[in-house]
């Protein structure tokens, strides 16, 4: 599982 910055509420998501 790779952690990447996304446009989610927390700004962090699992890619």
Swiss-Prot record:
- Record localization: Cytoplasm
Specify the superkingdom. Answer: Bacteria
Q: Return the annotated region ranges for Involved in cofactor binding.
A: 6-15
**Keywords per UniProt:** Cytoplasm, NAD, Oxidoreductase
Catalysed reaction, written as an equation: a 3alpha-hydroxysteroid + NADP(+) = a 3-oxosteroid + NADPH + H(+); a 3alpha-hydroxysteroid + NAD(+) = a 3-oxosteroid + NADH + H(+)
**Enzyme Commission identifier(s):** 1.1.1.50
Report if keyword NAD is assigned: yes
Q: Name one GO molecular function term.
A: androsterone dehydrogenase (B-specific) activity
> What is this enzyme's class at the first EC digit?
oxidoreductase
Coarse class of the primary localization is: cytoplasm
**Record's GO cellular component terms:** cytoplasm
Protein's job? Along with the 3 alpha-hydroxysteroid dehydrogenase and 3-oxo-reductase activities towards a variety of cis or trans fused A/B ring steroids, it also reduces several xenobiotic carbonyl compounds, including a metyrapone-based class of insecticides, to the respective alcohol metabolites. No detectable activity on testosterone, progesterone or 3-oxo-desogestrel.
Q: Which family does it belong to?
A: Belongs to the short-chain dehydrogenases/reductases (SDR) family.
Kindly provide the name given to this protein in its UniProt entry: 3-alpha-hydroxysteroid dehydrogenase/carbonyl reductase
Organism classification: Bacteria, Pseudomonadati, Pseudomonadota, Gammaproteobacteria, Pseudomonadales
């Amino acid at each position: 599982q790779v952690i990447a910055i996304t446009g989610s509420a927390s700004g962090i998501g699992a890619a």
